């Protein structure tokens, strides 16, 4: 009995071990540097070139501005806000192309562990949660979409949001939910925040009304608290959302202006 409890308690270690074995099998050529994990053109042309551009100009001392061209020129580094991008830059421009596989693997482990935590928080047995987490990160959707760096990040943030929602519902821990929403707003685009906000609302309605059987004032209290958390998160994100909204509505596609 004691041994089985220990196995159940530390089943997340088996998740990490199994993932490590599978990753060595699937990504060995990328890990040893024989091939570069720049599979899609978007990753090779957009993200890689953007990071190289940042490395070329980051030493000028003013963020978003470089004096390397004439009297100076602005550079948009707003898309490099995720902290793991800083991890990529630490290895320099010459080694940058070798780091993308590690960037991908870190996101895989984060997504798997967070999804595992979310499943166990829902009351699912830990061994079953291990299988669920493996299916989550080795699904066809994750593998295909991982060729674009931002898409794989969605899996991490979705798992974090699900875990944060359950922490709020079960432990009344609202801080983690605010962190999850803020990360969604800063690391992804505006429409991601809208889509996941609607999904969060639907999840809240279904969970509180059908699963916990909350009715009346208690039901609306939870809905109101979730709305308040969303408002606080949006206020924190105002510095990013307001310029993005203005840019969206002033674009030719939205304003119906032909270019």
Question: Where are the language model's segments positioned?
Answer:
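Membrane-interface extramembranous regions at the lipid-water interface
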Residues: 60, 167-171, 217, 221
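Membrane-interface coil-to-helix junctions
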Residues: 20-112, 134-155, 259
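Start-transfer (signal-anchor) and selected internal transmembrane alpha helices
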Residues: 1-28, 221-230
């Amino acid at each position: 009995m004691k041994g089985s409890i220990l196995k159940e308690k530390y089943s997340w270690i088996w998740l990490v071990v199994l993932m490590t074995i599978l990753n060595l099998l699937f990504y060995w050529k990328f890990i040893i540097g024989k091939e570069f994990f720049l599979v899609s053109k978007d990753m090779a042309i957009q993200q890689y070139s953007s990071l190289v551009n940042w490395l070329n100009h980051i030493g000028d001392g003013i963020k978003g501005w470089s004096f390397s061209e004439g009297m100076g020129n602005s550079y948009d580094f707003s898309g490099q806000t995720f902290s793991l991008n800083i991890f990529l830059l630490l290895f320099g421009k010459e080694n940058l192309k070798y780091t993308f596989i590690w960037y991908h693997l870190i996101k895989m482990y984060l997504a798997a562990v967070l999804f595992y935590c979310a499943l166990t928080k829902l009351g699912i047995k830990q061994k079953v949660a291990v299988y669920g987490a493996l299916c989550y990160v080795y699904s066809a959707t994750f593998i295909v979409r991982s060729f674009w760096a931002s898409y794989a990040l969605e899996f991490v943030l979705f798992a974090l949001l699900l875990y944060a929602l359950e922490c709020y519902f079960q432990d009344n821990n609202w801080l983690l939910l605010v962190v999850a929403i803020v990360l969604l707003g800063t690391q992804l685009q505006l429409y991601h925040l809208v889509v996941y906000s609607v999904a969060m609302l639907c999840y809240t309605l279904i969970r509180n009304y059908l699963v916990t059987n909350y009715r009346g004032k208690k039901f609306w209290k939870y809905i109101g608290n979730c709305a308040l958390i969303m408002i606080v998160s949006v206020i924190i994100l105002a510095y990013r959302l307001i310029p993005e909204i203005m840019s969206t509505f002033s674009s030719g596609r939205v304003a119906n202006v032909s270019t």
